[in-house]
């Protein structure tokens, strides 16, 4: 997967809420999001009052395809805990990195802290 992107929940929310960096995320589309990050995005949208089906449709309209979180990615995400915990990365963050590494893709995030350690994949931080 060259020139492919795996989106972190923060990048998808940035796009959907038209925040600073949304144009960059839009240029990365179509892209994928891992199931863990997808769950985070749905949770935030539902928390803000959006219906679950509407949230799902909104993500689909943006050409963001959810990918299952499998055993191999789970193992890699778990192994990243020791190097990323002190930086505050969540399970969703580590799951995104693991998926990007597995796909040979770039992880696109709004969290600059991802550039503070040696990630298993290329990382592009928007802010």
Task: Map each language-model feature to its residues.
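Short loop->beta-strand "edge-of-pocket" segments that line small-molecule binding or catalytic clefts
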Residues: 30-33, 62-66, 106
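A generic structural signal for short hydrophobic patches within well-formed alpha-helices
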Residues: 12-13, 38, 114-115
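A general structural signal for well-ordered alpha-helical segments in protein cores
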Residues: 22, 38, 74-77
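Acidic, PIN/NYN-like endoribonuclease modules and their adjacent C-terminal/linker elements
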Residues: 2, 97, 101-127
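Active-site neighborhoods of divalent-metal-dependent phosphate/nucleic-acid chemistry enzymes
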Residues: 66-106
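Amphipathic alpha-helical segments within well-ordered protein domains
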Residues: 26, 42-43, 59, 78-81
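Short, well-structured N-terminal submotif of metal-dependent ribonuclease cores
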Residues: 1-33, 45-57, 127
């Amino acid at each position: 997967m060259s020139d492919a992107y795996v989106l972190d929940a923060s990048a998808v929310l940035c796009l959907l809420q038209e925040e600073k960096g949304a144009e960059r995320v839009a240029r990365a589309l179509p892209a994928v999001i891992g199931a863990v990050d997808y769950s985070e995005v749905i949770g935030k949208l539902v928390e803000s009052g959006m219906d679950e089906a509407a949230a799902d449709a909104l993500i689909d309209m943006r050409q963001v395809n959810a990918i299952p979180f499998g055993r191999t990615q789970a193992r890699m995400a778990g192994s990243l805990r020791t190097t990323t915990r002190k930086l505050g990365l969540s399970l969703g963050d580590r799951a995104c990195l693991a998926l990007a590494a597995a796909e040979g893709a770039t992880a696109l995030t709004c969290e600059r802290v991802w550039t503070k350690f040696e990630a298993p994949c290329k990382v592009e931080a928007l802010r």
